[in-house]
Amino acid sequence: MAKDDVIEVDGKVVDTMPNAMFTVELENGHQVLATISGKIRKNYIRILPGDKVQVELSPYDLTRGRITYRFK
């Protein structure tokens, strides 16, 4: 899948789950299951419930995503 095919949306972390998984509520009200991208994991950026994040979604599976940025 090319990088151009992703859908980027903003959301808020609602819940944390085991294995660095998070439930994120998007701006349109949908909830997705998201993991942390490699660069966030490598730089030890902490993500807590209530944080505003940017999520990449694949057009093939809109229920799972990847957290690519945590807003300050």
Swiss-Prot record:
Record-annotated membrane-spanning stretches: none
Sections of the chain in a coiled coil: none
S1-like domain: residues covered: 2-72
Pfam families: eIF-1a
GO cellular component terms attached to this protein's record: cell surface; cytosol
Main location: cytoplasm
Keywords, ordered alphabetically: Cytoplasm, Initiation factor, Protein biosynthesis, RNA-binding, rRNA-binding
Localization: Cytoplasm
A Gene Ontology molecular function term of the record: ribosome binding
Domain of life (superkingdom): Bacteria
Family designation: Belongs to the IF-1 family.
Role according to the record: One of the essential components for the initiation of protein synthesis. Stabilizes the binding of IF-2 and IF-3 on the 30S subunit to which N-formylmethionyl-tRNA(fMet) subsequently binds. Helps modulate mRNA selection, yielding the 30S pre-initiation complex (PIC). Upon addition of the 50S ribosomal subunit IF-1, IF-2 and IF-3 are released leaving the mature 70S translation initiation complex.
Record text on subunit structure and interactions: Component of the 30S ribosomal translation pre-initiation complex which assembles on the 30S ribosome in the order IF-2 and IF-3, IF-1 and N-formylmethionyl-tRNA(fMet); mRNA recruitment can occur at any time during PIC assembly.
Name listed for the protein in its UniProt record: Translation initiation factor IF-1
Recorded name of the encoding gene: infA
